[in-house]
Amino acid sequence: LRETSYNKPELKTFVEDNLKKLTGEQKLAYDTVQSKIDKGEGGFIFMDAPGGTGKTFTSTVILANNRSNDKIALAVASTGIASSLLPGGTTAHRLFKLPLDLDKDEYPSCNIELGTPIARLLELCCLIVWDECTMTHKKALESVNRLLQDVRKNKRLFGGVVMLLTGDFRQTLP
């Protein structure tokens, strides 16, 4: 799997080169996420900022740091274009097997069976970065929450995995 075969020395160099480029607020976000991962706390972190302020850059450094340390860190986005900007990124619908018509059911569910390779990957991951989550239907987040709780056998929010949601509420219509 791609998620377990990253070039770790290259990622370590990337982190060393770019950690010092983070602004004060970006470094605070980085430290907050890393602290939760290192302590195994899990958590739900939202990074809200206008476009062009470095959310994707900060997320990329966070992903690289965890992947360089043999941790599974997944990157998804609400759109294909946004997912292509994250290393190893894919759409949330593809990774979580979300139904296309989320309004069809009151409680839609992800089409992932326990014991499958993708379920195992979700069980082992320490971090999920979800870019452009402000464009995501709330039922998608609820479905992923239930999936992670089931796969990880943990009833904490998102099964205890650290969820870094990024986006810009200024781009969302009322």
Where does each model-flagged region fall?
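Conserved ATP-binding/catalytic motifs of P-loop helicase motor domains
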Residues: 1-174
